[in-house]
């Protein structure tokens, strides 16, 4: 029987990860993320998606163009402003891209055997349960204090960003790819 690599799709909830990275005090490099998860002979990367909210159509243009040049499919939505009177009349902005992430997961489910989801949002719990029922292996990447318990419990494997920091952290100078260690399931 011929060897067939496991087909991988990566889904990055950019807004959720922005806050996780701020909490950690460091940022990951999108190129190094691809290398870490897909640069192994037993893995075939079939797609990588990045989802982010925008203040205006030109917001993050350079970053989005760089993501596309790395091979990411970039999905965007305009930020909406909300007023929270219960919190001292504070205004906040939000672009909820959860439904876009789930739609892409299910529209492409026949293309992959496993996914890596960068998010801590508990809204993904049911989608993850349904994908696991289809024999899809799910890894969720987030950080302690930013991941919903129900999401962490629904996944096959959880990786804390800080555990893979040395492999994915954004640095001032490009570094050669270093083979990633195998991280045992939590």
Swiss-Prot record:
Consequence of gene loss (knockout): Cells grow slowly on solid but not liquid medium, excess KaiC expression no longer autorepresses, decreases the amplitude of circadian rhythms. Partially restores sasA deletion phenotypes suggesting they are not in the same output pathway, does not restore rpaA deletion, suggesting rpaA is downstream of labA in the same output pathway. In double labA-cikA deletions KaiC levels are much higher than either deletion alone, but the phosphorylation ratios are nearly wild-type.
Pfam families given in the database record: NYN (PF01936)
GO biological process: circadian rhythm
Keyword field: Biological rhythms
Molecular function terms, GO-annotated: RNA nuclease activity
Gene3D superfamilies xref list: 5'-nuclease
InterPro entries in the cross-refs: LabA, NYN
Upregulating conditions: Transcripts rise slowly in low continuous light with little rhythmicity.
Free-text function comment from the UniProt entry: Functions in an output pathway of the circadian clock. One of three clock output pathways. Involved in negative feedback regulation of KaiC; deletion leads to overexpression of KaiC protein and decreases the amplitude of the circadian response. Overexpression reduces the expression of circadian genes.
UniProt protein name: Low amplitude and bright protein LabA
Species, as recorded: Synechococcus elongatus (strain ATCC 33912 / PCC 7942 / FACHB-805)
